[in-house]
Amino acid sequence: METFSLLMGGSPSKMFHLKEFSEKLEDLGMECKVVLDVDYCDGFPSRKISKWVFKKNKLPNLISEYKPDLVLVDRQRHFGLEVTKTRIPLLVHLRGDFWKEIEMAKKTIYKSIPKKIVINEWEKIGEKCFQESTIILPICNYLSNVVKNRYQNKKIQTMYQGINPENWFETKGMKLKHPCVGIL
């Protein structure tokens, strides 16, 4: 049986979920590598102005060393944009309504000229990632419908974001004398 290798690039806040997902895929025989996307690829626009001047693109080295069959991104930024320049299939995991978020950002906190430039560039990068992706993986049916309305010919598959409660809560069994659903 052929083994596939998957490279996952994600944001710091999603590392936990990507690592957990990677462990499940490895249990199924897939080879996975999870990286912080900005460690390998960053530049204009970025919240850190220093990244505008000192661009980072270590992604070609990572790709040549790891040789992934697929790349999954959990946000639409430089990492995904650089993957679109390769022949490697790009899977985009969509966790929110990207277009509504951009629209609201433009109306609220990104009104100044420098911030307008940044948000417009983020929008262009996002659109390029979506357009060039092999498949878009929204986390719910609502988002799948949003994507279908924007990209009628794009492969879209809902990938539900399951949450394992054992990661946050200690679960101790309860000893019930008379278990019931409710009082009759």
Question: For each predicted feature, which ranges?
Answer:
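N-terminal subdomain of nucleotide-sugar transferases
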Residues: 1-40
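A short, charged, and often flexible helix/loop element on the N-terminal side
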Residues: 36-62, 109-115
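Helix-loop-beta element that forms the nucleotide-linked donor phosphate-binding surface
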Residues: 144-163
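Acidic anion/phosphate-binding donor-loop and adjacent secondary structure
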Residues: 162-178
